[in-house]
């Protein structure tokens, strides 16, 4: 199990930030809108320019090709992008999705042929989670993964993501505005203040 180590991270005039997320650990991150939580995730995923050092075990962000880092450190944005109008075309191999994972999130194999344009925001989010997990990331960065879901699906998503983290022994950073959710899924929490400082504990 590898830890995600962040040392003196800076981006968009913010930071420096230093913290470690252990292998198999979920770190929760709370804070007001506009504080910079999404910017932090984007820097960790190497989607935005940044300074400092980010490493996952032997992999160092600035020393490997960006596509490799982004496959290894998977980020789920608050709103995922969809390029085609058929669900199955967004998956490397739709047939490799475990049937129990599809069922847990309220789908079966017929969803492969559904049209993206007819999906609700909640259906898109649940499918985005399945798409991300199919890549078998070795760390997860989650930007409010259940914000568009009802209570039942929130529970199913929490169960699926927590199960993946534990089975794979990966570090996970989970951003949420719901303190009760972070109490359920995260063993440790940080809070980002309105001026961008990171503090231990609740926001």
Describe each model-derived feature in a short phrase.
Residues 44-45:
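Helix-to-loop junction immediately C-terminal to a conserved catalytic motif
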Residues 60-74:
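ABC ATPase NBD coupling module
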Residues 72, 79-100:
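Q-loop/switch helix immediately C-terminal to the Walker
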Residues 115-119, 123:
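Conserved ABC ATPase signature
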Residues 128-129:
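Hydrophobic anchor residue at the start of the ABC signature
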Residues 140-144:
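Catalytic Walker B motif of ABC-type/P-loop ATPase nucleotide-binding domains
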Residues 175-177:
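H-loop/switch region of ABC-family ATPase nucleotide-binding domains
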């Amino acid at each position: 199990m590898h830890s995600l180590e962040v040392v003196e991270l800076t981006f968009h005039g913010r930071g420096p930030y230093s913290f470690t997320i252990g292998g198999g650990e979920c770190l929760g991150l709370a804070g007001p809108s506009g504080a910079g939580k999404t910017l932090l995730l984007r820097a960790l995923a190497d989607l935005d320019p940044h300074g400092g050092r980010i490493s996952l075990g032997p992999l160092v962000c600035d020393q490997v090709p960006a596509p490799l880092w982004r496959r290894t450190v998977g980020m789920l944005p608050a709103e995922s992008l969809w390029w085609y109008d058929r669900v199955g075309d967004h998956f490397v191999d739709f047939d490799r999705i475990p049937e129990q994972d599809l069922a847990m999130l309220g789908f079966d194999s017929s969803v492969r042929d559904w049209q993206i344009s007819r999906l609700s925001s909640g259906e898109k989010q649940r499918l985005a989670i399945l798409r991300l997990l199919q890549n078998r990331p070795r760390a997860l960065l989650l930007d409010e993964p259940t914000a568009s879901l009802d209570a039942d699906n929130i529970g199913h998503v929490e169960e699926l993501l927590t199960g993946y983290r534990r089975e794979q022994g990966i570090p996970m950073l989970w951003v949420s505005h719901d303190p009760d959710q972070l109490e359920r899924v995260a063993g440790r929490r940080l809070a980002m203040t309105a001026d961008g400082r990171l503090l231990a504990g609740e926001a």
